[in-house]
């Protein structure tokens, strides 16, 4: 019987007297078919190390440990540590780290893998309330994670994988797709969780590009410009740029010049710009002295 089997999950929770904490966004998956699909989507085998975030009682960890070389699972809730020691006792290739992933020194931690030179994949059922900070923290880290296969809120998955000229497209799409390809693999209904969340989830697969999708003079400024363009989605690019950078005649003249260099119409909205468009705009703004 699998940990994710509903009767087994309930028995584990009762045996340990565990109660869910809303502050940790805990929703445990109880569908073994979906867990197998996650492992298949991530293409986990013995030539790969895995980092898992929020293992809960070990439902996904069990599947990962059977397929991966090693699994390092970060769990912030110390009440779950003895439960994981119980449920994962048969595995000698799992390390459970009782730490907030955002505070972990991952560069040091991954040296604890028996073979730290193997490709590392991130496979996780991420808490909804902190999905974006965790993803951006890991993507922007200096660790070359090969890919991410994460279960997140469907709406966030749609935003991350969105293309220009769509309602979901925004600065988050750009921030992730600058580094990674992103595609929704399949939808997970809310009914397969204990307790059931209020929304459906999606499995998002992100694969790191060999290099960023565009070359820019200043990455921080590029991301800043992309955020500025979406501050007021219904406003034109010109309105958002002048609201942020200023409305003096000198500034407006520089903005006009930058848009001209980048060959972008001031009357369009941010959602119409592709990532290469934003790269051209950011570099042009730098060129004119903004």
Swiss-Prot record:
SUPFAM superfamilies: S-adenosyl-L-methionine-dependent methyltransferases. CDD domains: AdoMet_MTases (cd02440). Pfam families: RrnaAD. Keywords: Cytoplasm, Methyltransferase, RNA-binding, rRNA processing, S-adenosyl-L-methionine, Transferase. S-adenosyl-L-methionine binds at residues 27, 29, 54, 75, 100, 125. It catalyses: adenosine(1518)/adenosine(1519) in 16S rRNA + 4 S-adenosyl-L-methionine = N(6)-dimethyladenosine(1518)/N(6)-dimethyladenosine(1519) in 16S rRNA + 4 S-adenosyl-L-homocysteine + 4 H(+). It is found in: Cytoplasm. GO terms for cellular component: cytosol. Disulfide bonds: none annotated. The keyword Nucleotide-binding does not apply. Its main location: cytoplasm. GO terms for molecular function: 16S rRNA (adenine(1518)-N(6)/adenine(1519)-N(6))-dimethyltransferase activity; RNA binding. Its EC number is 2.1.1.182. It is an enzyme of class 2 (transferase). Gene3D superfamilies: Ribosomal RNA adenine dimethylase-like, domain 2 (1.10.8.100), Vaccinia Virus protein VP39 (3.40.50.150). Belongs to the class I-like SAM-binding methyltransferase superfamily. rRNA adenine N(6)-methyltransferase family. RsmA subfamily. Specifically dimethylates two adjacent adenosines (A1518 and A1519) in the loop of a conserved hairpin near the 3'-end of 16S rRNA in the 30S particle. May play a critical role in biogenesis of 30S subunits. This is Ribosomal RNA small subunit methyltransferase A. The gene is rsmA.
């Amino acid at each position: 019987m699998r940990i994710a089997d509903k009767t087994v999950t309930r028995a584990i929770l009762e045996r340990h007297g565990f109660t869910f904490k809303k502050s940790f966004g805990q929703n445990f998956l109880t569908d073994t078919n979906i867990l197998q699909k996650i492992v298949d989507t991530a293409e986990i085998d013995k030539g790969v190390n895995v980092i898992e975030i929020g293992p809960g009682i070990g439902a996904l960890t069990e599947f990962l440990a059977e397929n991966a070389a090693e699994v390092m699972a970060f769990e912030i809730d110390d009440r779950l540590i003895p439960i994981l020691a119980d449920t994962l006792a048969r595995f000698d290739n799992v390390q459970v780290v009782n730490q907030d992933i955002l505070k972990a020194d991952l560069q040091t931690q991954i040296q604890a893998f028996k073979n730290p030179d193997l490709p590392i994949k991130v496979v996780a059922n991420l808490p909804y309330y902190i999905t974006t900070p965790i993803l951006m923290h890991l993507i922007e880290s200096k660790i070359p994670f090969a890919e991410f296969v994460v279960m997140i809120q469907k709406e966030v998955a749609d935003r991350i994988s969105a293309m220009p000229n769509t309602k979901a497209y925004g600065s988050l799409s750009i921030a992730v797709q600058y580094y990674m390809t992103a595609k929704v693999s399949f939808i997970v209904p809310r009914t397969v969780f204990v307790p059931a969340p209020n929304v459906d989830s999606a499995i998002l697969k992100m694969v790191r590009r060999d290099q960023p999708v565009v070359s820019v003079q200043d990455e921080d400024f590029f991301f800043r410009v992309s955020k500025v363009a979406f501050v007021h989605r219904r406003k034109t690019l010109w309105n958002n740029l002048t609201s942020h950078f200023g409305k003096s005649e000198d500034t407006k003249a520089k903005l006009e010049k930058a848009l001209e260099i980048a060959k972008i119409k001031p009357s369009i909205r941010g959602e119409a710009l592709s990532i290469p468009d934003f790269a051209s705009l950011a570099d042009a703004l730098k060129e004119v002295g903004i």
